């Protein structure tokens, strides 16, 4: 398993000449998409990858919803191009999807099929480690991002916002 110091060094290397541009670097916008659809056939998976202030592939996983619970749940899986780091989280939305917040697995209705372990296994098979949520806010000196005032490990590996 990677340590945050390893990922911080890799981020510093990747950002040494400025923010990496996935389009210019030829990053694959479809990386893992078809394989994820096969790994999680019960869920709808949408590719949200773009390289506007993002340094990862981002996939939204929409499980079958539970009628009558008053919330809509979606998962997000991100695979960094900066290093082999993987992130997974759930968002709970109001039914109109205008308001949402990240929630732990424990707050999911038990009827929702949680693909977390399947995605962790998939990521490990591809050589990726899941980043500990406590590491996402680790500040990195010497990196200037385009949007964020402070460079953090999460912003350098996944999204600069």
Protein language model features and the residues they cover:
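Acidic, proline/glycine-rich low-complexity IDRs
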Residues: 119-161
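Extended, charge-biased low-complexity segments
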Residues: 2-126
């Amino acid at each position: 398993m990677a340590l945050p110091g390893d990922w911080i060094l890799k981020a510093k290397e990747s950002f040494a000449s400025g923010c990496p541009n996935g389009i210019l670097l030829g990053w694959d916008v479809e990386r893992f998409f078809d394989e994820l659809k096969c790994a999680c056939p019960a869920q709808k998976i949408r590719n949200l990858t773009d390289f506007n202030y993002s340094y990862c592939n981002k996939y939204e996983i929409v499980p079958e919803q539970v009628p009558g619970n008053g919330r809509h749940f979606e998962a997000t899986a991100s695979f960094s191009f900066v290093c082999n780091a993987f992130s997974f989280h759930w968002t709970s939305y109001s039914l109109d999807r205008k308001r949402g917040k990240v929630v732990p697995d424990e707050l999911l209705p038990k009827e929702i099929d949680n693909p977390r372990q399947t995605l962790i296994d998939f990521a490990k098979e591809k050589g990726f480690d899941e980043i500990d949520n406590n590491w996402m806010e680790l500040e990195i000196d010497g990196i200037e991002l385009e949007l964020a005032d402070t460079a953090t490990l999460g912003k350098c590996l996944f999204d600069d916002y």
